[in-house]
Amino acid sequence: MPGKWISALLLLQISCCFQSGNCGKVLVWPMEFSHWMNIKTILDELVQRGHEVTVLKPSAYYVLDPKKSPDLKFETFPTSVSKDELENYFIKLVDVWTYELQRDTCLSYSPLLQNMIDGFSDYYLSLCKDTVSNKQLMAKLQESKFDVLLSDPVAACGELIAEVLHIPFLYSLRFSPGYKIEKSSGRFILPPSYVPVILSGMGGPMTFIDRVKNMICTLYFDFWFHMFNAKKWDPFYSEILGRPTTLAETMGKAEMWLIRSYWDLEFPHPTLPNVDYIGGLQCRPPKPLPKDMEDFVQSSGEHGVVVFSLGSMVSSMTEEKANAIAWALAQIPQKVLWKFDGKTPATLGPNTRVYKWLPQNDLLGHPKTKAFVTHSGANGVYEAIYHGIPMVGIPMFGEQHDNIAHMVAKGAAVTLNIRTMSKSDLFNALKEIINNPFYKKNAVWLSTIHHDQPMKPLDKAVFWIEFVMRHKGAKHLRPLGHDLPWYQYHSLDVIGFLLTCSAVIAVLTVKCFLFIYRLFVKKEKKMKNE
């Protein structure tokens, strides 16, 4: 009987979808890791609303698993890059970024960062070439007549596929280094006087010295840093599209930019009509915990529990560091649930249980959870915001330093340095975040802000995708600045013209005064001679 009801509801949903004419075909060019987790949340909701979703999956992708998403359709195709190559590259990238990249100033880590990003650019260029050169795949996509393409611009190529298929496309994005893509292709307005550039590790109000550092970072990312190697990508895009173009120009044709952030994490800055903020779209009310885990949580009594997770991308932690962490956790009266996949530390206390996987969102939503020790990835930070849990941040790579810097500035977190952190540092941070009501108060305040939106983040994302499908784009929201070359966008031609006019007027004025002066001098001399 329940099966019949489910079938009936599905039929009703599909019939309503067809009657309203809103059902569509969505093509997806995904990125791996947490990027995929976020975009998958959107795709699952699209399927629930009756849309047909097809995900392009390069064979080199090793995290994205079609078996875990039976409602989505996958087009897997061969690539010249192997899974092992891509996996080894990302493992090395994360480890170098976590333990070797200098973070004193943007200039101190710039050579190593650029070298890592160049490797990323080359791998994705290979994947992109494998995609568009696959005639059988592209013919199949042409025949499918998709209505829209959804992509993450950090994994370039989605915009090229959309252009070849002549369909509109949207971006779902957390950030690009230094806001490079957002500024060069999206024309985002991010004044360095009060908006800390991403990867600077700064958050909130800046001192004079902070603003100097921020300006240096901005100049570096705007003029020296390259997210993608334009010398390789631009000719490739021009060749495929049959006209002179660039990667940045093609990216600039995105109908909407769905940014996986919001004003609970970010500080206010100007925004554009074709940009919307969908941070925390993956967050949900908590589900019941497994019985053994619930029993352990309940055994904590009035002290409650601490959730500890440094994510799944960091492949190594020294035994010394693991023992220091375990010692610090053993000193607090709270029970601890620690996501850890290494050798069991010798200093592990009886109050701590180690798990290879944790239902993180459900634990953070549990009434006994007192604090969250996190690597400060955007997903974990947003789950903590959603449930109003204060944080101890131990950032490692990417924008994690920026995420936790914002939370510290908003009074909902303290932060530690993974490279220099001692066991006493972690112990003191835990005592501060648990015992000082200041942090809990601010975490709850951020949670209230997050929940008090006119539309849920996931609903906003789906709305804009359906909007673009209904109207075949969103050109009326696209600022005219997208169509201007850089010198016109910054009014350099106008400034040059006005400076030239001012110079001409100044020269003419001086010449006129000199002429009049000489005329009077000559007359005076003539009168004296007479």
Curated annotation (Swiss-Prot):
The keyword Signal applies. GO terms for molecular function: glucuronosyltransferase activity. It catalyses: glucuronate acceptor + UDP-alpha-D-glucuronate = acceptor beta-D-glucuronoside + UDP + H(+); 17alpha-estradiol + UDP-alpha-D-glucuronate = 17alpha-estradiol 3-O-(beta-D-glucuronate) + UDP + H(+); 17alpha-estradiol + UDP-alpha-D-glucuronate = 17alpha-estradiol 17-O-(beta-D-glucuronate) + UDP + H(+); 17beta-estradiol + UDP-alpha-D-glucuronate = 17beta-estradiol 17-O-(beta-D-glucuronate) + UDP + H(+). One of its GO terms (biological process) is cellular response to glucocorticoid stimulus. InterPro entries: UDP-glycosyltransferase (IPR050271), UDP_glucos_trans (IPR002213), UDP_glycos_trans_CS (IPR035595). The chain crosses the membrane at residues 494-510. It is found in: Endoplasmic reticulum membrane. Its main location: endoplasmic reticulum. Induction: Constitutively expressed. It is an enzyme of class 2 (transferase). Its EC number is 2.4.1.17. It is a single-pass membrane protein. Residues 1-23 form the signal peptide. Belongs to the UDP-glycosyltransferase family. UDP-glucuronosyltransferase (UGT) that catalyzes phase II biotransformation reactions in which lipophilic substrates are conjugated with glucuronic acid to increase the metabolite's water solubility, thereby facilitating excretion into either the urine or bile. Catalyzes the glucuronidation of endogenous steroid hormones such as androgens (epitestosterone, androsterone) and estrogens (estradiol, epiestradiol). This is UDP-glucuronosyltransferase 2B17. It comes from Rattus norvegicus. The lineage of its organism: Eukaryota, Metazoa, Chordata, Craniata, Vertebrata.
